């Protein structure tokens, strides 16, 4: 019973934290009609898409956040010694966080359903295929960025500062990046392209410059994938056992 109450309390707190972002948008649009040409429904769709992307990441890939911890306490040695692919072991071992992100699924899907109807977002199988493609690439991009930052633990044992940077950038992309200075737009589009997790997919679904943005998304995901592999291989070579 105590466990169930803790579970409910944690999820309720998480839902309330997510709803703060929704309430902030509602408050802003109670004062203005548009945010840099973005309507309230479009901004909420963008936020809901990001919640869904993060929920999928937290379901399947959250163990990448524990790379630094495993390196520090020596558990990473166990992955290397086993006759299995090290990366596969990282993803398939016991979850870093035992609770599944039901809150992010619920709030994210609710926002998408509610706003998609008002925006007439889905109008045929093509739009559904496009949505699935954008969701997959957004999750991959989000995973890749966090994986790269976590893999820096091979050189910087305490790499939490890099994850903190990502968390701060996440707060920025809760709103369309059009509202920010050009320097910030470049930072979240090219340097650390976390805007791939929701802004660019949203623009694509809204039909604004879809072809060029699709090429950018696909190209960026390929580049991120290559960087993932290179950094991982370099890190594995640089790794020194805690018992060495």
Language-model-derived ranges and their functions:
Residues 1-244:
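Hydrophobic transmembrane alpha-helices and immediately adjacent juxtamembrane helices
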